[in-house]
């Protein structure tokens, strides 16, 4: 059984946390500000430099919400201090990525280039033509945008061509063997 919800969250210096009456937790830090609505049954207690997330009962629903709420708050604290990044690699002949102003332009073997607008709160870097880095303070937003980019051309199992996360292992298949 997981006991993630019972762990206290360390608050680094320079991070300010507020909880209002509607159970909305706001975290301000050097990189920005994030807020998240926590379920009404879960209470968030802030002390000097420690946050405790408390559940009212031991039933299954409250235990699940407890771990979720604690992780959401911990991710917000880490996001406003360190930030998150997701790296993507483009594998395939002619697969390229470039930045044109605030747009990410991908050449992925389609008859047209794929243009994706940079969302608010995220920064996109293209260190080389085959690498894309998505950075931001909101872990969920970074992951969703990286998944959106990957969705345009997932790695295929025969040659491994496509957009993949850095370090992702693509399971390869053997092609058909002729007679």
From Swiss-Prot:
Spell out the molecular function terms from Gene Ontology: rRNA binding; structural constituent of ribosome
According to the UniProt record, one GO cellular component term is: cytosolic large ribosomal subunit
Tree of life domain: Bacteria
Q: Name the GO terms of the biological process aspect.
A: cytoplasmic translation
> Matching PROSITE patterns, A to Z?
RIBOSOMAL_L6_1
Report if keyword Ribosomal protein is assigned: yes
* InterPro entries assigned to the protein according to its UniProt record, in alphabetical order: Ribosomal_uL6-like, Ribosomal_uL6-like_a/b-dom_sf, Ribosomal_uL6_a/b-dom, Ribosomal_uL6_bac-type, Ribosomal_uL6_CS
Q: Which UniProt keywords apply?
A: Ribonucleoprotein, Ribosomal protein, RNA-binding, rRNA-binding
Similarity comment: family membership = Belongs to the universal ribosomal protein uL6 family.
Query: What does this chain do?
Result: This protein binds to the 23S rRNA, and is important in its secondary structure. It is located near the subunit interface in the base of the L7/L12 stalk, and near the tRNA binding site of the peptidyltransferase center.
User: Assembly and partners?
Assistant: Part of the 50S ribosomal subunit.
Q: Entry's NCBIfam families? A: L6_bact
Q: What is the protein named?
A: Large ribosomal subunit protein uL6
Species, as recorded: Alkaliphilus metalliredigens (strain QYMF)
Q: Which gene encodes it?
A: rplF
